[in-house]
Regions:
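ATP-binding/phosphotransfer module of carbohydrate and carboxylate kinases, centering on a glycine-rich
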Residues: 1-57, 68-70, 91-97, 114-120, ...
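Short beta-strand segments
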Residues: 7, 59-63, 126-132
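A cytosolic small-molecule/anion-sensing beta-strand core signal
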Residues: 19, 62, 69, 139-140
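Hydrophobic "anchor" residues
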Residues: 23-24, 73, 143-144
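A charged helix-plus-loop insertion that forms the helical arch/lid used to bind
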Residues: 72-83
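Conserved phosphate-binding catalytic cores of ATP/NTP-utilizing and phosphoryl-transfer enzymes
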Residues: 88, 99-124
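Active-site glycine-centered loops adjacent to acidic/histidine catalytic or metal-binding residues
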Residues: 104, 130, 294
Length: 306
């Protein structure tokens, strides 16, 4: 069985033909249309059409609140033109084939559960650190979608009750690569729009630049506190960290150290006795995670997997 797989991001659409063994062919990417949903549908059809005779359908991972049963997207996230529309039905009508949809963060979590860093886990979580914070929650060995398909939408988690109205006090704004770079610009006295990316930041941090290391420590504490909260709420065995910066050993090493420090800072409290610590690991899949997860979601839907 071969499937046309789309990983729809805010800036690009990654695509490939993938089989049940995760073998990928004809992989590539194109810019994501920013103007209209009609342009978006035209783009998907143009990518699908050359492969229509060799694939059984389309599997998609995309941003937003995605009802995987009906294909309805109640909130399009980075692609607001999808908000309130039957994306699954629209793609199916345009391409003339079966279509399955999954939220991008949940797709990444499904990939890690089925074939990555979370194989065999009963309770676990995935944090995808990027422009925002995505991911998914695993409970009792199953991906948790929630009654409204919004489980695991970490970006909306409030980080400061005293500033509830300030949307800057959410995980999206505190624990994202976007915020890491913004803190670094501010620490260096650079303009808020100064060109900067994660690789440049970690080049500075790995070189021992004091300002970069100071910002990294602050950032890791913001993330570690949320990992701690997950530990308390869900008793997770592992938290897998994904996103481009997760490839940096310095990030994972610093995050583990800061996370352990949270427990040590309350070490003399009798109420901390027996509170478990989770294992922080890097995601196994990187840029292919959403495609792999979209494929697994498709295979579950058509009954090809247990």
């Amino acid at each position: 069985m071969k499937v046309m797989v789309f990983d729809v991001g805010g800036t690009e659409i990654k695509y490939s033909v993938m089989d049940e063994g995760l073998n990928r062919t004809d992989a590539g990417s194109v810019p994501t249309p920013q103007d209209t949903q009609e342009h978006f549908l035209d783009t998907l059809y143009a990518l699908y059409s050359p492969h229509r005779d060799e694939v059984s359908g389309i599997a998609m991972a995309l941003p937003g609140f995605v009802d995987t049963r009906t294909g309805f997207v109640s909130n399009g996230g980075a692609l607001l033109y999808n908000t309130g529309t039957q994306v699954g039905q629209l793609v199916r009508e345009r391409c003339g084939c079966p279509v399955t949809l999954e939220n991008d963060g949940k797709a990444a979590a499904l990939a890690e559960l089925q074939a990555g860093a979370l194989q065999g886990c009963c309770n676990a979580a995935v944090f995808i650190i990027g422009t925002g914070v995505g991911g998914g929650i695993i409970a009792n060995g199953q991906l948790v979608r929630g009654i409204h398909f919004t489980a695991g939408e970490y970006s909306f988690v409030n980080t400061n009750a005293d500033e509830w109205e300030n949307t800057g006090k959410t995980m999206a704004c505190q624990c994202s690569t976007t915020n890491l770079l913004q803190w670094y610009r501010a620490r260096r006295g650079l303009p808020a729009d100064a060109p900067m990316n994660g690789r440049q930041f970690f080049d500075a941090a790995n070189a021992g630049e004091p300002e970069a290391l100071e910002v990294l420590e602050r950032f890791c504490k913001a993330v570690a506190v949320q990992v701690y909260n997950l530990t308390v709420l869900l008793d997770v065995e592992k938290v897998a960290i994904g996103g481009g910066i997760s490839k940096q050993p310095l990030l994972l090493d610093s995050l583990r150290r800061v996370y352990a420090g949270l427990f040590a800072s309350r070490g003399d409290s009798p109420y901390m006795i027996g509170l478990p610590r989770t294992e922080i690991v890097p995601c196994h899949f990187s840029s292919e995670a959403n495609q792999v997860g979209a494929l697994y979601a498709c295979l579950h839907t058509v009954g090809r997997m247990d």
